[in-house]
């Protein structure tokens, strides 16, 4: 394992969530909050009965039934930052959110290397366009009075030794997300650090998938539970409320 990789993993254990200048009280959930989850197929699948969005919604409803909080899924398969920019008004802003969680970046990287995507003539997102796009979306979201929780991308491959082909680029794009969160005074949820720390601890056989994902990218039940716990922590909701069985939700269309 490289020294750089060790540093990333140690940081992952030490710090996953960083907050804006607002206090924890200000970042806590409030009555009638509307939380939109903006992302790709990981978030689209997160709306399934055992998905991370559904688990998060159920935990919030259980912890704070009196707050009438709505959770809205806005994930679409294959989407990248430019795709999210194009549908931001229809899929996010028109839902009148008070909180928007942006979990994007996997396809922005993966579409540079995935053979099927490359063969089709499609491409990933340049680092510059990734950064500019995140900045633009956050500005529009803040403009309607909503706050942003910006996530770093998770994994494309679960090998814990840093040998997954896209690891270096994912680290680069994650650093961009961290930079954007800081510059826009947004809350950062560093999913990549958390996932790397988990895999370093639980993937002793250096398997390429099966610990947190079904196919090296999309979440299995363990991955969805971890995602939900991390999101709940960012929202200051007790993770003990994560349902083990199929939960009832308070999700909005």
Positions of PLM-derived features:
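Bacterial N-terminal signal peptides that target proteins for export
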Residues: 1-10
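Alpha-helical cap/lid subdomain in secreted, periplasmic
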Residues: 2, 29-30, 54-70, 82-252
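Bacterial N-terminal signal peptides
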Residues: 10-19
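Boundary at the C-terminal end of the N-terminal hydrophobic targeting segment
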Residues: 22-25
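Catalytic nucleophile-elbow at a beta strand-turn-alpha helix junction centered on a G-D-S/GDSL motif
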Residues: 33-48, 77-80, 109
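Active-site neighborhood of phospho(di)ester-bond hydrolases with catalytic His/Asp-centered motifs
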Residues: 37-39, 73, 103
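Short, solvent-exposed turn/loop segments enriched in Gly/Ser/Thr/Pro and often Arg
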Residues: 74-77, 154
